[in-house]
Amino acid sequence: MSAMGHAAVLVHRSAVRYGLALGLTLLAAPLARAQTGTVIGTITDRGTGQPIDAARALIVGTALAAASDTRGTFIIRGVRAGSYSVRVSRIGFRPEVAAVTLAGNDTARASFSLTQSAVELDQVVVTGTGGAVEKRKIGSSMGVVDMAQVQEQVAVTDIGQALAAKVTGLRSVSVGGGAGAARDLRIRGTASFSLSQRPVVYIDGVRVDTRATEWTNATGISNKVACCSFAGGTSTDRLNDLNPDDIERVEVLKGAAAATLYGSEATNGVIQIFTKRGKNESAPSWSLAATTGFDRLRPNLPTKLFPLFTGPDGTQARDANSLIENGPYQNYDVSVQGGGTRSTYFSSAGYMDQEGSIQPNYEKKGNFRLNLSFLPTDKWTVEGRSMLTRNTIAEEQAGNNWTALLGNAMNGNPRNATAQKPFGEAWVPVSDIKQMQTYSDATRWTGGMTLNFTPAPAFTHRFTLGLDDVNEQKSRFFPYAGQYGPAGVTFGQRNLGYRFYYSWTADYLGQYTFHIRRNITSDLSFGGQALKESERLNIAVGNTFAGPGVSAVSSAAVTAGGEAYSEKATIGYLAQDRLSFGQTLYATFGMRVDGNSAFGDNYGFKRYPKADVAWVLSEYAFMPSFISSLKVRAAVGQAGKAPGAFDKFQTFTARSVLQGTPGVVPDNPGNGDLRPETTTEQEAGFESGFFHDRLGVEASVYFARTKDAIVPKLLPPSAGFQTAQNVNVGAIDNHGWEASVNYLAVAHGAFDWTTNLRLDGNHNKVIDLGGVLLSGTAIQVGYPVQGIWTLPMTGYSPTAIGANGRAPNFTRSSTNQYAGPPLPTFNASLGNTFRYGNLQFYALVTMERGAVFQNSDRPYRTRQGGADEYLQFLNSDGTPSFQADSVFNYWSLFDAVDSRDNVRLREVSLSYTIPERFLARTNLGRTQLTVSGQNVIWWDHCHCVDPNMNWAGGDAFGVANGFLAQPAPRQYRLAIRTRF
């Protein structure tokens, strides 16, 4: 027989063999399914006897799981004959395990009565851990936020609001007051001189856009024509695109020691958002939430004395507080979830319409989500997720901006009030600002697919592929013949910008569990990740129109355009081994190796090692009985922060010379040795529970040092470059502590009382600048990054002539003096929840201490002659008194540095759950009515409207100044949530 003939026979035999095997498998599959049974269980709260919804029941060692419905019932079908352990868990409760046995197609039943717990060592988490693992095995600190619990307490508008004061070490505060405005979101302080301080955010394993600053000036167009901020310092926040009602929980990795496996973008921590999923063996379960209410600024604008004065034409000056309105709010969400034996679904749709307290300003947002899962076999799970968002914002003009609406109203002089400028506006009439049209329109699709393969109970594989695609358009229109600057009347302008952003995520994680010895288990994780981000900005501006009614850029007499593009790619590999010594001691060792397109050409891959240990002492018999849980832990790890996409490149900027002849000039000098900033963090702490876990106490201390921090080094003029060269020569120390106490003070019958106390402190210091001399005072060795400095007063003379030509006057030092850090060094929050029967009351109070800010509004307002602290000292005829002259001349010489310390009633609510007997004929499930307030009242000494204001948006590094910004409003809501 020829070789070809022999090969044909072998192929034929192989085909027959595999065909028979496939046929037998297909024939056996129905028989196997015929021998499967069902597990049915009920889950209740041991303290109240009420059913627990959304608890997860898992057949240990398999992928078979289900979630409980509103009656606390779960059904798991397709369970093969045998003996199993069923594990039931829910955030806020101690998990329970029960044994069941199935013979053939029997039905096994189990009942679970869960106990509320202030400590959750057995809670399963997945972010940064190399696979799903109980918290008892982790040696670093992690925060988990249960969105269902948050929404039962208060109606939230966005995810940033939901995270505020919920996790120690996480700062989430509103820095602007308009609808859709950004928040400052950061974890454990500051670890860089110039790079973004926002944590990396993932949604169901997919990296997403979190931009929270204006994006227009990146095109370089501003040197061609007066352009091109759209809303001044006010910025939108892409995290606001998310629908809080779609979220199940949020996991927060607080620092480098915990986030090592995320590599070169994880220095600032990692936030992973998990959206809701369907339920196996569940008929369609509908949820409906409707919320109405309003936003209203606190009437504490410092212009209450304005109406006491009249202008030169007899116009009575207006108080800026008269601009405050009730901004209506409405939000509607509907969702359905369910599934069969091997498939589940969750789908939702939402619509929000929010108007600002200062008009014109609104946000209109529509969301749609579809999450599907399918188990084609017992070994494969396929999950698909998709979110579509359309978000339109009429932006408020605010923040270091000639056309800032409140800024013009508050910084006027009431003695200059006219019919056109009733606030005595120094720059732009408020009436003209209200005619401006500033919009942000974003369309966003975020989705992905995850494949889970479990060839054996001890061997799992997970592959995730996802995309975040954001298309954003911004526009600003100045109508013809309005006054939009100190120069007077303009002939109109239109700014138009487009931003296209996408982020691809590809992630693989394998995990193999095996026994080294009888009581020593190894959980070996391995995998890789590829990320690619791209951002393109296109800007056009048209200036000077022929007349009213013209608004197209192309119709303007003067036009200009600009474009910017950036792309960054990361590929990383990881390996980790977690050793379990019985149920008491766990040790983890791991490493991530990264390559990044932003690394210098002379720099290769970066290695990030980690190690942690967790010791559960409460498993030992010698522990006192009142200590129900006790884990001590320690961790050390590295994470990085990659440079900007083009920082390593030598670049040139195009210029027109010699009457339009194109040319180039040197721009960025580049650096082929540029490498990531690297933070090494050491952390230690404990988690403990007392009295059957009714009292939970957790504490952590951490010390982090950032090396290779990027510093801009000025080059000699002979080098010919316009900008400084980025070099890795800096070092920053960042250290702090965190503590929390959760106490189920009363859990008896109809009455419950739960209290939560969270405390944290943080300090940072510049250690080294590598000999580089920086301009300004914000970065100084031995002081905090972006510390606040000022020129102090050195003398006072009652007869010396000041800036207004009158006495008294002051003298100041020529040397800057350190005033304080820009971020709080101490944060605290105290939350209390009281429940009596179907009635629940909740309140959350927060405190911030230790920070200062540049209160530029205060001296500026005085120099304009319109600050209440100046007006109160004027004589009855309007002439300045000696005290008024003193105030005026002081603030003509000095900048104001004021305290950011404040105590705030951040959240308060009253909820009522309608008794089931009233709903029996309506087919409705659990129905709750909630009246709530956010940002209700605060106490401060800042001589400002709100100490948290920041004119430059939510991620504006190094800015601690509320100049012309708008404060966050009070928010009042009435919500109803029901299921059917």
What do these predicted regions represent?
Residues A552, Q659-D667, R705-V729, N756, ...:
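Surface-exposed, extracytoplasmic segments of Gram-negative outer-membrane nutrient-acquisition systems
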Residues L297-P299, R318, Y329-G350, Q354-N361, ...:
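Flexible loop and strand-edge segments within Gram-negative outer membrane beta-barrel domains
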Residues G866, D877-F980:
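Membrane-interface anchoring segments and C-terminal beta-barrel signals
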Residues L26-V124:
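Periplasm-facing N-terminal accessory domains of Gram-negative outer-membrane beta-barrel systems
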Residues Q161-G220, E248-K254, A259-G278:
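Extracytoplasmic beta-strand/coil segments of soluble accessory domains associated
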Residues T310-Q337, P479, Q483-Y586, V636, ...:
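Outer-membrane beta-barrel transmembrane domain signature of Gram-negative proteins
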Residues R56, V60-R71, V125-V156, G180-D184, ...:
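N-terminal periplasmic "start-of-domain" segments of outer-membrane beta-barrel proteins
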Residues I203, G314-Q337, R342-S348, M352-E355, ...:
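Outer-membrane beta-barrel transmembrane strand signature
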